[in-house]
Amino acid sequence: MRATIVFQGQILEPDAFERRVLRSAAVLRSVGIGEGDVVAMLMRNSPEAMEVMVATRHLGAQWCPVNWHFKTDEVQFILADSGAKVLIADAALLSALGGLQTGDAKLWTVRGSVPEAAAWEPVRDAMPSLDALPAAPRGAMFYTSGTTGRPKGIVREPMTPAQAEASVAMRRAAYGIESPLRALLTAPWYHSAPNGFALGVVLDGGTLYIEERFDAERTLRLIDEHRLTHAYLVPTMYVRMLALPAPVRARYDLGSMRFVSSTGSPCPPDVKRAMIDWWGPVINECYGASELGYMTLLTSAQALQKPGSAGAPLPGVVLKILDDNGRELPAGTPGLIYIHQPATPDFSYVGNAEARARMEVGGLKTMGDIGYLDDDGFLFIVDRKADMVISGGVNIYPVEIEIALQGMPGVADCAVFGIPDDEFGEALAAAVQPAAGAVVTADAVRAWLSERIAGYKVPRIVSLHAELPREDTGKIFKRKLREPYWAGRARNV
């Protein structure tokens, strides 16, 4: 916990950060938080988010980051489904959620106050530090979008000592963490990858510069001014920085950077090459999942040799390509990607044992991605068996959007799917079949959805169809809707 946190020009030195973590742990313990309990966190990137996360980990409890773009109903579901005993929320975010019912969960706010909740900081500062050894860490309870239309909560088993040691090695490989380091966090910490990046820096005793949101030129300025060494960025951020005028890009010295980690969505080879040409051989890409951890790593040198690859398995990782019958496929033959990552404790889904069981074959687990290994053992991802869309590094399952849209008057049926986007990797498109005699417009569709789901889930493209293409079974033929958008692309994700 000997980390330094820098936020909005204020420096939280290691002694002060450790004191706040142990006082936060004492507050949580005082309301009954212990091993296996859940602390929900509706918080923007901030020092308070880091201290509550580490305090929860210290108690062997699970921190449950909540996407701050979610609407009231979405937050309500996660609170109820996770069984969270505590919700700590940014006051501004909580105020924007009208009618949120927290049930029996204890509610605190940070960075402001609201009438219905106590402010966190005064309670924390008045509490003596917890004097107790840390419990076995359980990790975060991330909610990952699911094909049922509701997200699934990931419940981790406690880490064994061997897994704890292996997880340190995994984070160091995936994020390039090595002391001393000065790291930059600009991606939303509620996603598993930036969350793991921030946690790794803090546990390693590094200096973490926290930004509430990403800004292309400000990122360059921070690297230059503070001689930052590490960052977690996603391809969308690369695109935005590359779009800056050449004189702006040339203004900043980025030579201090040693390791940039990227994951979430595939990085187009031309974007990666442009970043390597600009920043040098410090651009790295991982393939991973909230459930399974990091699986592969692709360095800059490897990216230039094998454009389009997702990398080679990390040390200790078992990666196999299997057919639908569980048979291993030879190099060059696409199939389902199955993984075993020994650094990641086993998990279950809250109330969904069936979905968890479907993932596993012979001790290996799959997220439903389709790919192949080349003769050198490098992974190439070519498609997804599931319908998940990754836009700007965010996982989105269309079924949730389809359920919301099917409730719109005048809509007979619909299909939501991913289409290529140069900035975000993928964008959402909706194909809508109006009911007989109904008048439905694209603007009306977007307005309907905007009132019911987070803004990033609202499709950018809405097309209207007299009849949607269907398979013999009557199921909508999404592939026929997607294909025209992906024509001429090297891959379909």
Whereabouts are the PLM-identified features?
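A short helix-loop-beta submotif of the ANL/AMP-binding
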Residues: 38, 44-64, 68-72, 81-86, ...
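AMP-binding/adenylate-forming catalytic core of the ANL superfamily
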Residues: 49, 70, 87-89, 221-223, ...
